[in-house]
Amino acid sequence: MGLIVYYSSRSENTHRFLLKLERRLFRLPLGAEEDVPQVSEPYVLVTPTYGGGGTKGAVPKPVIRFLNEPSNRNLIRGVIAAGNTNFGAAFASAGDIVSRKCAVPFLYRFELLGTEEDVANVKHGLERFWTR
């Protein structure tokens, strides 16, 4: 099964959700002072959504830095986004933005830590996605 590249802030919400998937994970660094990592295989990106309800600033800066590297951008195959339903139409909007800019499918959205149903849906969805 393919690699999951993800960003999780200090809140660790995205990280804790992904640990439940029991898949290969590659975490993007928190700070801008670290070099941009390079991946060498296709991956699905998982990102939280920032910005308090608007689309400006919705994609975390470390995710933008990572995707601005052409070699990383060429290997993205899909995106999953976390968000907060309190932000209405902007819920998980980082996924919409990455999907549009990278021309990849937006596979799933979940709220904060996700539910057990979200975990099952993502596990099953990724299995189908990588074996199609």
Swiss-Prot record:
UniProt-listed Gene3D superfamilies: 3.40.50.360
GO biological process, any: protein modification process
InterPro entries noted in UniProt: Flavoprotein-like_sf, RNR_Ib_NrdI_bac, RNR_NrdI
Annotated GO MF terms: FMN binding
Family in the record: Belongs to the NrdI family.
Functional summary from the UniProt entry: Probably involved in ribonucleotide reductase function.
PANTHER family xrefs: PROTEIN NRDI (PTHR37297:SF1)
Name of the protein in question: Protein NrdI
